């Protein structure tokens, strides 16, 4: 069984002092405009497995094998694929955003503490129990549930 980690909202997070994203076979990351860093849309998949890497590389490029013995487009297609290639400009935006990640995580942590302080004043709102780990996106998932008062 191949395990794919959904790390779309956890960029920069840690668990047991280890960065998330390399515990499983593959990891999915999102760079949508609502995430910790953004390129406007899209994301990436990371893996240390050569077979998975080759498959993902082909899949994102219309299924091209990118065989160096043949010109691009004349190589074989063993799988169907789509156009999920990232342009250079989107990649450049991502690199600039990545430089801001530590500051984004720090600001999110400050925001979480402010929200937590305010929300604790309302007994009908239950806060999620957050473990003592670095969570980059936690302020957006603060409330566990509301008690309805009828």
Each PLM stretch: what is its role?
Residues 1:
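A short helix->loop->beta-strand "cap" motif at the edges of active sites that frequently abuts
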Residues 14, 50-150:
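PLP-dependent aminotransferase class I/II
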Residues 22-65, 88:
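Active-site PLP attachment segment
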Residues 5-38, 68-69, 73-78:
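Conserved active-site segment immediately N-terminal to the catalytic lysine
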Residues 4-5, 87:
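Active-site flanking residues adjacent to catalytic metal/cofactor-binding acidic residues
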């Amino acid at each position: 069984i191949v395990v794919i980690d959904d790390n779309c909202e956890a960029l920069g997070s840690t668990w047991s002092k280890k960065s998330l994203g390399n515990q499983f076979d593959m990891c999915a990351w999102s760079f949508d405009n609502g995430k910790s860093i953004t390129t406007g849309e899209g994301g990436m998949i990371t893996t240390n497995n050569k077979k998975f890497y080759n498959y993902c590389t082909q899949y994102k490029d219309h299924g091209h094998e990118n065989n160096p013995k043949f010109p691009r487009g004349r190589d074989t297609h063993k799988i169907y694929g789509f156009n999920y290639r990232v342009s250079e400009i989107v990649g450049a935006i991502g690199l600039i955003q990545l430089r801001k990640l530590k500051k984004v995580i720090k600001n999110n942590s400050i925001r979480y503490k402010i929200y937590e302080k305010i929300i604790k004043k309302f007994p009908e709102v239950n806060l999620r129990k957050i473990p003592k780990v670095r969570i980059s996106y936690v302020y957006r998932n603060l409330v566990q549930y509301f008690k309805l008062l009828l």
